[in-house]
A protein has these predicted regions:
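Hydrophobic core residues within well-ordered beta-strands of beta-rich domains
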Residues: 13, 125-127
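Short, solvent-exposed beta-strand/turn "edge" segments of beta-rich domains on protein surfaces
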Residues: 8, 29-33, 100, 116-123
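Short amphipathic alpha-helices in soluble, non-transmembrane regions
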Residues: 43, 142-151
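An extended, acidic, His-containing surface patch that forms the Zn2+-binding/catalytic region
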Residues: 56-116, 123, 140-144, 158-210
């Protein structure tokens, strides 16, 4: 078993993406890709496909550095030699939701709203996208990334972005060479002598960020 001491917590931001187009009737749809729903769909696909870059760095790197010597087989070899096996390990970690969240600011498409009648083309379509910010990334950086991706799918005068209230930056990373970390480390080892103790990243949101 492994016991992870949380040394940082990811940030939180939800952004509303709103697309506008000329409303109309479904009997005479506009040119391909120009309706509000079509542009929103293209923008969301781009945000899903072109997420913020990930990597084994920061808290994740420190966690694997700590755990690697205690592992066996190829896992020990790979995690102890990320300079060589880094791309392979990263691809493997990105394949699972729980470990992918350790490597990057995640993008989650959570709400979509558009239209209210089956034969009417709406003049507006919007979606909410939730981001969990990795330490080192910022709210402004995420908005810039999002704006850049959406502008590849829709004209800039057809969309707007705004962050919902309650957004918070990622926490600072607590040092692992502090007296507090050493005390927690020692206590955990005394209570759970078989556990591997390592620094960890809290990928969800808690009151601890305050």
């Amino acid at each position: 078993p492994a016991a992870l001491i949380g040394v940082a917590e990811k940030g939180y931001m939800s952004v509303v993406l709103r697309l506008s187009a000329t409303p109309g009737h479904s009997s005479m749809p506009p040119p391909k890709g120009t309706s509000a729903i079509a542009m929103l769909s293209a923008a969301l696909k781009r945000l899903e496909d072109e997420q913020l870059p990930g990597g084994i760095r920061g808290v994740a790197a420190e966690m694997f550095d700590t755990l690697a010597p205690e592992m066996g087989g190829f896992s020990r070899v790979a995690l102890s030699n990320l300079w060589l096996f880094g791309p392979l390990v990263q691809k493997q970690l990105e394949g699972a939701a729980s470990t992918n969240a350790l490597l990057r600011t995640t993008t989650a498409l959570t709400i979509v709203n558009a239209g209210n009648k089956e034969n009417v083309l709406p003049g507006r379509a919007e979606a909410t996208v939730n981001f969990r910010l990795l330490p080192g990334d910022t709210k402004d950086g995420v908005l810039q990334h999002m704006r850049g991706q959406v502008s590849q799918a829709a004209p800039q005068d057809r969309f707007e972005l705004f962050a919902l209230p309650g957004a918070v930056e990622a926490s600072k990373v607590a040092p692992t060479d502090s007296a507090q970390y050493r005390a927690l480390n020692q206590t955990i080892r005394e209570v759970f002598p078989d556990a591997l103790v390592a620094p960890g990243l809290m990928v969800a949101g808690t009151d601890s960020i305050h």
